[in-house]
Amino acid sequence: MNIQIVTVGKLKEKYLVQGIAEYLKRLSAYAKVSIVEVPDEKAPEVLSDAEMKQVKDKEGVRILAKIPDDAHVIALAIDGKMKSSEEFAADLDKLATYGKSKVAFVIGGSLGLSEAVLKRSNEQISFGRLTLPHQLMRLVLVEQVYRAFRIVRGEPYHK
């Protein structure tokens, strides 16, 4: 399985870089995983609704340009469907079983994802109703993908 994680902005925090690198190393035994960063749109601290939409739309164009046409797209969205780790694992396994070898996860910037990206997605998931920094979501996502592969293969993983 080829998994692409498309994210907005550059990762700056050293502890996140190290954590993600560790899980990418572990994941290499199960799948080819790549992270693609697209530039975030510079914006003032306070934005009108129209300005927020404009920022998300510009970031959305950049995101969509990086997603392969034949990829199954999973957008991480606050209003997405919540799943347990076991459900997430089963869903990834089904994708592999039914020939979806390319999966693209999308993590938006601090304002979220554009309507165009949400429309392009095949599904939207949420890891909870908490608001987490989008950069931290990268680490959470790669950990959950790793956990999913361990669950599917019946391999032990601490709870």
Swiss-Prot record:
S-adenosyl-L-methionine binds at L76, G108, F127, G128, R129, L130, T131, L132. Keywords: Cytoplasm, Methyltransferase, rRNA processing, S-adenosyl-L-methionine, Transferase. GO terms for cellular component: cytoplasm. Pfam families: SPOUT_MTase. It is found in: Cytoplasm. InterPro entries: Alpha/beta_knot_MTases (IPR029028), RlmH-like (IPR003742), tRNA_m1G_MTases_N (IPR029026). It is an enzyme of class 2 (transferase). It catalyses: pseudouridine(1915) in 23S rRNA + S-adenosyl-L-methionine = N(3)-methylpseudouridine(1915) in 23S rRNA + S-adenosyl-L-homocysteine + H(+). One of its GO terms (molecular function) is rRNA (pseudouridine-N3-)-methyltransferase activity. The keyword Chloroplast does not apply. It comes from the Bacteria. This is Ribosomal RNA large subunit methyltransferase H. Specifically methylates the pseudouridine at position 1915 (m3Psi1915) in 23S rRNA. Its EC number is 2.1.1.177. Homodimer. The keyword Amino-acid biosynthesis does not apply. Belongs to the RNA methyltransferase RlmH family. Disulfide bonds: none annotated.
